[in-house]
UniProtKB/Swiss-Prot annotation:
NCBIfam families: hisZ_biosyn_reg, PRK12292.1-3. GO terms for molecular function: catalytic activity, acting on a protein; histidine-tRNA ligase activity; transferase activity. Its main location: cytoplasm. HAMAP family: HisZ. This is ATP phosphoribosyltransferase regulatory subunit. Required for the first step of histidine biosynthesis. May allow the feedback regulation of ATP phosphoribosyltransferase activity by histidine. Keywords: Amino-acid biosynthesis, Cytoplasm, Histidine biosynthesis. Belongs to the class-II aminoacyl-tRNA synthetase family. HisZ subfamily. It comes from Clostridium botulinum (strain 657 / Type Ba4). GO terms for cellular component: cytoplasm. Pfam families: tRNA-synt_His. Pathway: Amino-acid biosynthesis; L-histidine biosynthesis; L-histidine from 5-phospho-alpha-D-ribose 1-diphosphate: step 1/9. GO terms for biological process: histidyl-tRNA aminoacylation; L-histidine biosynthetic process. The gene is hisZ.
């Protein structure tokens, strides 16, 4: 057996320096959006009992979970999603809270990825859950919060696609298709494989009811703006399906009325592979990333598995994919704090330290130099992206070097503070 002490497991990643700072900035910005939209942050354990995720509504297949055992032999998992633990917390610790609950989180989730397709095994998700209301107001609030979150990060040209989990269920419930065939049908529609869909429906046409075959056959083609809803209605008389279509229509119109209609579209072929969704579902896309950067929807039956029946809706943003998109768009909108390095002679240590503390209070990144040689100080500063070098070497004015302009000046402390605050 080889020695793996210099490596990390497949699907994991070390995040260093500037990339780490950018990621933290993104997380902080999302937290601000949630906070000022009335959401309260909660934190769940990284390790949960496997039973939390092992119900008849299985969000994540068990083979996608990282499993381990505790000292009593019980199966544990690294949490594969955040919505289910929040359902557990709500059902066990929040029964007496004021509803609707508006919760938010930013946390890492873990999923086994057997395929060598570059997908991460550790993913940072940031999202919200609105718990305790059934009406479309909470669906609209969730989607609008998602749009505002992406806008706050400076992301361009994204789209939130709306679908409805109940639509597919309504169209197939009378067909009584076996579970295996149902999974196959979902996958074909999700992949918009028109040829395979027609072939599949032809093969089962003699065995099952053909009542809604026409609209099912057209589901992959039914995407675009709000006119798609009327086209879909013309293809079915299924009352449950028509209700699902009306829900999407009303949600779309509400978001349009707010003034955010340009960020949404409809995709009636959106069929989720996560079983707990019951109503409107949505995914966020941007050209620079192949997969969805955001996903969410209504899940009214999940929390009952933890002791209380409560409807809910929410979404999760993939922070790692957001970083990729922002980098490719060259639209990092995070504030870049000025960086200062202070070098000093030993007799001026206290003055240098006090000045460093003053600058930190003004949100300027500042450190005392651990090096003494001028060349070493300059090289270190350039490599680390320092903006200004300040020197405490005499009683009079302080040495100041602007590394961008390469200019040198001797200034009073208040003059330096004015310079740094520009």
């Amino acid at each position: 057996m080889g020695n793996w002490n210099k490596y990390i497991p497949k699907g994991m990643k070390d995040i260093l320096f500037e990339e780490s700072n950018i990621k933290l900035d993104i997380e902080d910005q999302l937290r601000k959006i949630y906070k000022y939209s009335g959401f309260s942050e909660i934190i769940s354990p990284t390790i949960e009992f496997y039973d939390v995720f092992n119900s008849n509504i299985q969000a994540i297949p068990q083979e996608k979970m990282y499993k381990l055992f505790d000292n009593l032999g019980r199966i544990l998992v690294l949490r594969p999603d955040m919505t289910t633990p929040i359902g557990r917390i709500t059902g066990t610790k929040m029964k007496d809270c004021t509803y609707p609950l508006k919760l938010c989180y930013t946390a890492n989730i873990f999923r086994v990825n057997e395929k060598l397709n570059g997908k991460r095994g550790e993913i940072t998700q940031s999202g919200i859950e609105i718990i305790g209301t059934k009406g479309i107001k909470s669906d609209v609030d969730s989607i609008v919060t998602a749009i505002n979150a992406l806008l706050s990060l400076g992301l361009r040209n994204f789209k939130i696609e709306l679908g409805e989990a109940g639509l597919f269920e309504a169209l197939t419930e009378n067909m009584r298709i076996e579970e295996e065939n149902l999974k196959k049908l979902k996958e074909i529609i999700r992949n918009k494989n028109y040829v395979a869909l027609k072939k599949f429906l032809d093969e089962i046409s003699l065995k099952y009811s053909k009542e809604d075959f026409e609209i099912i056959e057209n589901l992959p083609k039914l995407f675009g703006d709000i006119e798609i809803i009327e086209k879909a209605k013309a293809l079915t008389k299924n009352e449950k399906a028509l209700k699902s279509l009306n829900d999407i229509y009303n949600i779309y119109k509400s978001i349009e009325d707010i003034g955010l209609g340009s960020y949404i579209s409809i995709d009636l072929g959106m069929v989720q592979n996560i079983d707990y969704y019951t109503g409107v579902i949505f995914k966020g896309y941007v050209e620079e990333v192949g997969d969805s950067i955001l996903s969410g929807g209504r899940y009214d039956n999940l929390i009952q598995h933890f002791g209380i029946e409560l409807p809910a809706t929410g979404f999760a943003i993939n922070v790692d994919d957001i970083m990729i998109a922002l980098k490719k768009q060259n639209t990092m909108s995070m504030d870049k704090d000025k960086k200062v390095l202070i070098f000093y002679k030993e007799e001026f240590l206290r003055k240098a330290y006090d000045f460093m503390q003053e600058l930190k209070m003004k949100k300027i990144i500042c450190e005392l130099s651990l090096l003494d040689e001028d060349k070493e100080i300059l090289l270190y500063s350039k490599k680390k992206g320092i903006d200004f070098i300040i020197g405490f070497t005499r009683e009079e004015k302080l040495f100041v070097k602007d590394l961008k302009s390469d200019k040198i000046a001797f200034l009073e402390k208040n003059e330096i503070e004015d310079l740094l605050m520009v």
